[in-house]
Amino acid sequence: MIRRREWLRMATAAVMLCGNTVFSQNDPGKASIGRVSVSVYYATDGDPKVAGAKAAAVTQEIEKCLRGEARLRFKSYRLLGQDVQPLLRSYESWAQPLKPSDEVLVRFEARSAPTPQATGLDLELWLSRKKILKTDARLGGNRPLFILGPEWRGGRLIISVALAPKKNPGS
């Protein structure tokens, strides 16, 4: 009787181990088809130091893009945080640019396979755990999508969503 139980336990363990390898094949929906960069900027006509010591100056390229839009024109801009996440073939991804805070979250999901010219995304912006924006975005080339966010410390938050370059240029 004891040997039968031991044999049954061993057989059950073997089936579980073998079954686990059979069923754990790669899910093609989890394949990374690109990368998305989400940045949060602080824009103000006042003193940019109120953004805090961790806020970094933005590049001239980003500043030029921001000043190119009438509603985004401010005297100074600071980068508050950035997150780069993979764009998965069939699953949603979440970016958390102000880590460890979850005050600003961006959910995105691919609508189509990315091309060098553009990529279609389902995009949601969440502030303070509330969805405030849902849109179909078409991101192209080096042109980010800017979203004018809420007022903050005498200025405004600007959320930027853009395609990020691949980690390995050859892949």
Which ranges hold each PLM region?
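N-terminal export leaders
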Residues: 3-9
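Outer membrane pore-forming secretion/assembly proteins and partners of Gram-negative envelopes
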Residues: 2, 25-171
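Cleavable N-terminal signal peptides
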Residues: 11-12, 22
